[in-house]
Curated annotation (Swiss-Prot):
Residues 15-178 form the PPIase cyclophilin-type domain. This is 41 kDa peptidyl-prolyl cis-trans isomerase. It comes from Neurospora crassa (strain ATCC 24698 / 74-OR23-1A / CBS 708.71 / DSM 1257 / FGSC 987). InterPro entries: Cyclophilin-like_dom_sf (IPR029000), Cyclophilin-type_PPIase_CS (IPR020892), Cyclophilin-type_PPIase_dom (IPR002130), TPR-like_helical_dom_sf (IPR011990), TPR_rpt (IPR019734). It is found in: Cytoplasm. The gene is cyp41. Keywords: Cytoplasm, Isomerase, Repeat, Rotamase, TPR repeat. Gene3D superfamilies: Cyclophilin-like, Tetratricopeptide repeat domain. SMART domains: TPR.
């Protein structure tokens, strides 16, 4: 075993089990740099296990139950205030605060674990995870670890809606601790979910060595995401199916370089963009998410090479959703166009007839009301 392997084996590996809005979101596993910043790493490790008991402020020295109280997209997610919960509190295992150990490591990439502070020598329990490189923090905050797995969970937190940088849904460290034995050794091994998906949720996290994904790789991943979504749909797991289709679209949105790709790659990417958007529209229909259904259908319709069959399908799904948000005029336009493209489609014909019938009834009612008013 190399000396590098020895060092990595000696590094602590700890975990957070996260809930968002009361629902399980997944596990984040961190590797701590005990070999570079041992005091800082030990503080975090012990706060994950809770082994130090109650602190001087009367609260358990434990991250369990605390939240990510500050989230700034394209910057970082911050947590660790288990005393006040709002960024004003926290306590280290050494007392209220401890000194900056060293600034040897730089904030040169996403998914680094670093100490939050209120100035030099004010480290407590608060920490942040970078979601982009943040070089302006070098020399001011101590980097002491990195995310080994669970990057998608970090991204979920990063993408939460916020009010004054505070997430509108609570992102809670429901459980935390230290990994040991086989669990620690395998912590950085990618594992597939129930549908076979082992890709990162966001394409920038799937890329290696800072190199953008090739068009062929994006095509494969997005195709796989469609298959994962189809499996989830057949299993009746509609929210997961929707997530998989939307994940595939995130990869397609990378707009890869096509110069050195096979001639039909763009055609395949466009066809996949249509089907993923159309499938997402269907999931949103079934979940009664009408605005999202319209946006997904519009995504399919925006592809210039969409076939008449797929256009009719997307127009129907858009029209169906427009009816449900009481946008009758837009629904009529969508459904009329869909019927021109697929005049024998029973669902389109029936929905259009229902909209016209409702419109006629509304007009008759309005006419009767006006007549009564002027009589």
């Amino acid at each position: 075993m190399s000396s590098t392997d020895d060092v990595k084996q000696a590094r602590s590996r700890v975990f957070f089990d996260i809930t968002i809005g009361g629902k399980a979101a997944g596990r984040i596993v961190f590797e701590l740099y005990n070999d570079i910043v041992p005091k800082t790493a030990e503080n975090f490790r012990a706060l994950c296990t809770g082994e130090k008991g109650v602190g001087k402020l009367g609260k358990p020295l434990h991250y369990k139950g605390s939240t990510f109280h500050r989230v700034i997209k394209q910057f970082m997610i911050q947590g660790g205030d288990f005393t006040a919960g709002n960024g004003t509190g926290g306590e280290s295992i050494y007392g209220a605060k401890f000194e900056d150990e060293n600034f040897q490591l730089k904030h040169d990439r996403p998914f680094l674990l670093s100490m939050a502070n209120a100035g030099p020598g004010t480290n407590g329990s608060q920490f942040f995870v970078t979601t982009v490189p943040t070089p302006h923090l070098d020399g001011k905050h101590v980097v002491f670890g990195e995310v080994l797995s669970g990057k998608s969970v970090v991204r979920q937190i990063e993408n939460l809606k916020t009010q004054g940088d505070k997430p509108t849904k609570d992102a809670v460290i429901a459980d935390c601790g230290e990994l040991s034995g086989d669990a620690a050794v395998s912590a950085d091994t990618k594992t597939a979910d129930a549908y076979g998906d082992e890709y990162e949720d966001f394409p920038e996290d799937e890329a290696t060595d800072g190199q953008p994904l090739s068009a062929s790789k994006i095509l494969k991943i997005a195709t796989d995401c469609k298959d994962f979504g189809n499996k989830a749909f057949k299993a009746g797991d509609l929210p997961v199916a929707l997530d998989k289709y939307q994940k595939g679209l995130r990869y397609l949105n990378e707009d890869p370089e096509l110069d050195n790709e096979p001639a039909d790659t763009k055609q395949k990417l466009d066809a996949l963009r249509v089907s993923l958007n159309s499938n997402a529209a269907l999931m949103n229909m079934k979940l009664s998410a009408w605005d999202e259904c319209i946006r997904s259908a519009d995504g399919a319709l925006a592809v210039a090479t969409i076939s008449d069959k797929d256009r009719a399908k997307a127009l129907y799904r858009r029209g169906y959703a427009q009816v449900r948000i009481k946008d009758e005029d837009s629904a009529l336009t969508s459904l009329e166009e869909a019927k021109k493209l697929a005049p024998e489609d029973g669902a389109i014909v029936n929905e259009l007839a229902a909209v016209k019938k409702a419109a006629a009834a509304r007009m008759a009612k309005e006419k009767a009301a006006y007549k009564k008013f002027f009589s």
